[in-house]
Amino acid sequence: MSKLVLATGNQGKVKEMASLLADFGFDVVAQSDFNVSSVAETGTTFIENAIIKARHAAKETGLPAIADDSGLEVDFLQGAPGIYSARFAGEDATDQQNLEKLLADMEGVPAEQRTARFHCVLVMMRHENDPTPLVCHGSWEGSILTQAQGENGFGYDPVFWVPEDQCASAQLESPRKKELSHRGKALQKLFAALKDA
């Protein structure tokens, strides 16, 4: 099994990504196990931020690193929260505060205007100076509910309506979420790229 550093401090992402990557034969180690310092996400796109995080983790650990930059894009909000999804309600906002801000911003918006999607960009760098990092993107179409539903998942999962299963993302069991989610789709692409490499 290949060891891989997961460049995130988000424990929800660590749990979900470790489970997904284990399916592909990777032994995932969280960057917190190496005391990797935080790095400013100064990019203006999901791709730029994922590269910044993967390069930083690879540099500090000496191991291959994978970084995820993901977020929710709401059409009514002209794509917000986007790359600012984790800090939509402020720099140190909790998942609950971000979710509450989203619901407040969407209050009174009719169902047909509540379309949204999750995006996930995964970047894998074999080392800090990798000139050809693997970059994979996945998206997941849905809409924004008027109130939270479900106990599973993290972030915006309780308000993200999944049309395929007629429930909130937070109501999905883990195997089904892996199959449908933006992160699961991006990881499938990453695994296919690794097999071809």
Curated annotation (Swiss-Prot):
Its cofactor is Mg(2+). Binds 1 Mg(2+) ion per subunit. The keyword Magnesium applies. CDD domains: HAM1 (cd00515). GO terms for cellular component: cytosol. Mg(2+) binds at residue 69. The active site is at 69 (proton acceptor). Keywords: Hydrolase, Magnesium, Metal-binding, Nucleotide metabolism, Nucleotide-binding. GO terms for molecular function: dITP diphosphatase activity; ITP diphosphatase activity; metal ion binding; nucleotide binding; ribonucleoside triphosphate phosphatase activity; XTP diphosphatase activity. This is dITP/XTP pyrophosphatase. It comes from Photobacterium profundum (strain SS9).
